[in-house]
Amino acid sequence: MKVFDLHCDTLSELRRAEMRGDGQTFARNNGHIDLEKLEKGDYMLQCFAAFVNLADPTPGADPLVTALEEIDVFKRMMERYSDRIAPVYRPEDIRKNAEAGKISGMLTIEEAGCCKGSLGVLRRMYELGVRMMTLTWNHENELASPNVVPGNGPIWPCMPNTETGLKEKGFEFLAETERLHIIADVSHLSDKGFWDIAEHSTRPFAASHSNCRALAPHCRNLTDEMIRVMAEKGGLVGLNYCAGFLDDQPSPDLCRSTTALMAKHAAHFKQVGGIEIIGLGSDFDGIGGKLELSDCSKMPLLADALRKEGFTEDEVEAIFFRNAQRFFENNL
């Protein structure tokens, strides 16, 4: 069965591997995602995020440089393995690549703070191929506030930020991303920021890697009200495989990442927002711990868990790739 994944942090890992010179490549590596595993997993499309940590302690770290270097990794991947994987810039590219027997790669950004508040840089990111973007990661920036409250680290589960959302520059970025047809991604955005986008957006938006707060009460997850609004607006949510966003335990160390829990979240999404809202957003190469889905080649395990949860074969296909394919073909 084909797979369409809305989020991974593989570019960041590959950039670090190049800096270390340890021989890890996109063709084959020890992480969750490489080309060999994607082919084994029968992937239709993988979204690759250029991830930036605004609090990077590396001396001289520049968020824009980091993002551009990760985008350069993506470009070189697409060029070197062009017989096996190809980029997506336009809606029709997804089908064209599939018909050519190639996996699709879509470039995204996780932390629009790398643009340093510049609409010119944002437009340049579009020209480089970026087609989806979170306004924040876990740190405040010129655009908006994240869903992690400062000083919230020792608290479990992490409580949501309901007080601060998009700033003036954030609203400008939202308008420009919509004009460019860059998908606004609300994963990592504060609750207030979510509602700002829900109120002011004119196009469908995504939560590329978030789960259900009703099942796992973490600030990174969506409330039922958020799920309903996203469904009404034609949005898309990617199931996140991170244990802390799947399980409801008194300590993060006790949380599990299992396909059964993923299927429970999928069932809740379906109950609240309908089957059409659900996609996959693994967060592979950005999450740790013991994962039942130990890498991207193991996706049949999740398909089996969804069937056991009561999903029909058509619904499993909708979650695995059809919903996401439709969403991007309609909105890029």
Predicted regions and their residues:
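Mid-to-C-terminal alpha-helical segments outside catalytic/metal-binding sites
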Residues: S294-L332
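Active-site beta-loop-alpha junctions enriched in small/polar residues
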Residues: D9-L11, F51, R90, E110-A112, ...
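Short catalytic helix/loop segments, enriched in acidic residues and glycine
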Residues: M19-K40, L301-A303
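Short acidic/histidine-rich active-site segments
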Residues: N240-Y241, G273-C296
